[in-house]
Amino acid sequence: MQLIAFLAALGVPVAFAATIPSVPLNHSMIDVKLSAAGNSMVKATITNNGDRALNLLRFNTIMDEHPTRKVMVYQNGAEVQFTGMLPRYMMSNLTPDYFVSLGPKASVEHSFDLAATHDLSRGGKITVMAQGTVPTAEEHGTTITGHTVYESNKITMEVDGNKAAAVVQAMGKVKAGSIDKRSKVVTSSCHGNQLQVLQTALANSARLSQAAAKAAQSNPRKLQEYFKATDSGTVQKVVSRFMSVARESSSNSAGGTTYYCNDSMGGCHPGVLAYTLPSQNLVVNCPIYYSDIPALNKRCHGQDQATTTLHEFTHNPAVVSPFAQDLGYGYDRVAALPASKAIQNADTYALFANAIYVGC
């Protein structure tokens, strides 16, 4: 029940009453140990527990070098608002630099400043923990062949609010631009045919979301495959979320998000298709969104512009509340998620919509 309470806490855009999850001692191929390393600095030590080498993908994990959600931060029983980015990474053509290689029993350390992705200006005592999944490849390989879960220890830190406030936020505020009221797209951020590409993606996202909502009501076998449940509560939530994405994708000035064709905040790191700032209800496309994926993909579970936009909309609290997280990437990992996590996972919605469109 504590884990369920934790999952209910995921993704809330403002602090709220929450139960801090206890950490079960499940066996994992890796061990993650957190330790305080300064006022708001945390050091994560990742150890390979096994007897064979592992190649660990950094994307959306405790090892991600970008300002992604690496840990959960609580204060007075409430989750502290996350101000960083939630990216969708391209999962094909992975290169070795996206991975961390760990030999048997070897460790690697990764440090990060919580104040760069959380508002800790109030200061005081906070509790920090990490939980997630790491896609794995064979030693020296770049093809994902499995995954391992991790659950860290919990640490308590006493934060000096003034020092935390002096830390520059990793993702600042975007400058206002010319907005197309029809789609809430900042047209001044678009170059060449990018506006046309994005408008097509928005239309396709609306169409796929509407079809997915219908399928959630009429195809219990497919709903079970992706969301691991077919009860009325699950159906209602899935349908509601897809319809919310459909409305946002076809918004006539009533949408709750702002969409940028291009990045002005430095979030388009290698491999990032698009990203969301949930604290600002803001979506940004990256160059490879236009160059490396098609408008629609007719391959089962293939990435495309439409489902990437759909994926990012589920990260926005103005569209989906509580907003979806990145708890598992790709079909194999999504298929392994329990119902409580599947319904809070952004890629579950993108893959389900693709499956209905393609007929997987």
Swiss-Prot record:
Catalytic activity: Preferential cleavage of bonds with hydrophobic residues in P1'. Also 3-Asn-|-Gln-4 and 8-Gly-|-Ser-9 bonds in insulin B chain
Propeptide part(s) removed at maturation, as residue ranges: 18-182
Localization, UniProt: Secreted
Enzyme Commission code(s) on record: 3.4.24.39
Signal peptide residue numbers: 1-17
Tagged with keyword Nucleotide-binding: no
Keywords, in A-Z order: Cleavage on pair of basic residues, Disulfide bond, Glycoprotein, Hydrolase, Metal-binding, Metalloprotease, Protease, Secreted, Signal, Virulence, Zinc, Zymogen
Gene Ontology biological process terms from the UniProt entry: proteolysis
Gene3D superfamilies in UniProt: 2.60.40.2970, Collagenase (Catalytic Domain) (3.40.390.10)
Active-site residues annotated for this sequence: 312
SUPFAM superfamilies, sorted: Metalloproteases ('zincins'), catalytic domain
Residues involved in Zn(2+) binding: 311, 315, 326
Record flagged with keyword Hydrolase: yes
Cofactor, how bound (note): Binds 1 zinc ion per subunit.
Superkingdom of source: Eukaryota
GO CC terms in record: extracellular region
EC top class, as a word: hydrolase
Disulfide bond positions: 190-261, 268-286, 300-360
Molecular function, one GO term: metal ion binding
Family to which this protein belongs: Belongs to the peptidase M35 family.
Function: Probable secreted metalloprotease that shows high activities on basic nuclear substrates such as histone and protamine. May be involved in virulence.
Protein name in the entry: Probable neutral protease 2 homolog MCYG_04257
Organism: Arthroderma otae (strain ATCC MYA-4605 / CBS 113480)
